[in-house]
């Protein structure tokens, strides 16, 4: 560190030595001579003293200057280059708190002055408007005065408005000058405020005055005089009334501050375009939203109710779900009828397990042999009969008992008043017996239990009571409400007691109907007859059905051309609880559809077409939704093998039963798809459908016509006829099993343990083994195991016993084994001989 004396420091700062010594003494330093040394700390102390004496304390600078210099090279034509230097300078000044407070106070004063000026301007405008209205009223009164006074001379009325007109220009000029001065002052204040805000980097304040967009003045009628507003505006502008006028008290359009919520009404189905229209958005927006949800749609796509509700709620709208049943409601209203109710016969459904004797019991009651006419001895249709007994008329419905006819039994329970549950005394309660009990309970129908085959050895009534009590059916003998009757359909034992129990239950139910009302009923069965067309079996539930009535049945309609009873005899009318077959419908209705007599054909056609379209839309919407739901589940999976079937049956109930049974077959690899089904014979269109879709033709109690047989023979289609439902199900199961292919299974034939290893010039390492399990065969695949771990898999090349080739070596014998392409055999290894067998897979 360089030594500096007081004298040298005085020369450096260009100050006299005496003055410097005096300042050092004032700073409290001990220097008194010019030759004394001054250290750096003493210099700092002196500098601080000098700054404080000049009222400039050691603090951060209030002004900062930033300089930036950048140099770049600019190339010009040829090899010349020019250096460009850009210099930027920026100065930041920190203001004191006093200046900031003064600035804020000045801004507040200016803002308050601007607001006062604007308020004064508004008050002046209001006063001016009131004056103008008063002046306009006075002018109008003066103009109307001459017309009102017919008697006096015109000259006498003229001087009256003169004072007002004379004073008008003076007051108008004064008001205009005052308003102009206030307007200029307000404009200067606003300009000054905006300049200050711009200097501070703030957003300009918005004046409380609402600026209104100038618009063209509407042309005035030719006969109207110049208004006072125009005169005053012209005077204020000083342009003689020329130019555009400002409209006062006009509000411009304001954007909505929040989202607009619409009330969206959604029926069972709705298209994308209709949904967008109700939400007041473009259809493309809805399509885009659904694409984001992972659902590709078009504007004409039909959406189901749940999907449309989800979209509308996600977009923030209120949803109201409605049912498109206005037409149905009007139809129901028109079918109401008031009349005298009378008692009617009970409708009794006979239910129970297959082969428990339901049809045989009915045969005895009807004195007819129905069971003998059914294929395979089992009932495959719903039979409807009405029987006149000594105690009154009873209508019976005979339902199938096989597992495939669950839907038929459910329909039978829904259309009935009483259920006779037939249970074989020697067989007990079976699965379909339990199902019949469940159907009866679901429909709220009372039960009468008929314990059949009571004459057979091994009949145990107490066992039946025990098993049914588990299902919730308790006999009257045990304190319940269900009568148990012992019967024998073969011998006729107990049939009278059974009918008495049924009629007793009917009296308790007090069954009534109105015979004078239009007929109403339910479809028990339907089929397509080759000569007569669609034939439907109807159970009339209320009113009277007559020949010639126009009927609506589900999505079908038509006029009743003919009516037949269960024996095939024509009848003219059918009352309550009477089953009949009707002809004249335009198609085969679904079993379970309700039939109603309507007033005219127009109404029937309208409702039928509405139901058809509604069913089609709902079906398409659900199919599309299901397809979209499964698109990600099936992605990456192998496609299922499908057995396509075209199925034709004699009646609609059998078609439903077969479709339900066949649809339940299959697994994750194979499935059954009924691509075409209908009632009636096999036609050319069915054969062409089977040809186009590579399907199998099944006919249940129907046959193919000549055209269909020709196509089947030419194209080699597979067509099969059946009359028992078991056979169809078994054949389809076999076909699906064949489509599954086979599995490869490994069978271990034998195991040999290596006792020693020899070397052979021909085969290499030869393992001397003892067969410890099974039999070892030559030319079979083997595995080499070491410590129970597979280390090699190959083929057995050489097998010898006592130097002779052997085809096989049994357990407990020694042999030499040569493993093909493997020489690393060690003592203690095990050689496992196996074979691969293909095994057929099952469902």
Swiss-Prot record:
Report the family membership: Belongs to the TRAFAC class translation factor GTPase superfamily. Classic translation factor GTPase family. IF-2 subfamily.
Protein name as it appears in the record: Translation initiation factor IF-2
Q: Where is the composition biased (Low complexity)?
A: 139-173
Q: Which positions does UniProt annotate for GTP binding?
A: 352-359, 398-402, 452-455
- Organism expressing this protein natively: Pseudomonas putida (strain W619)
Q: Which residues form the tr-type G domain?
A: 343-516
Q: Name one Pfam family in it.
A: IF-2
Q: What is known about what this protein does?
A: One of the essential components for the initiation of protein synthesis. Protects formylmethionyl-tRNA from spontaneous hydrolysis and promotes its binding to the 30S ribosomal subunits. Also involved in the hydrolysis of GTP during the formation of the 70S ribosomal complex.
Any keyword GTP-binding? yes
Task: Give the residue ranges for region: Disordered.
Answer: 50-72, 94-260
Q: Which NCBIfam families match?
A: IF-2, small_GTP
| Location of region: G1 | 352-359
Q: Spell out the Basic and acidic residues composition-biased ranges.
A: 96-135, 174-203, 227-236
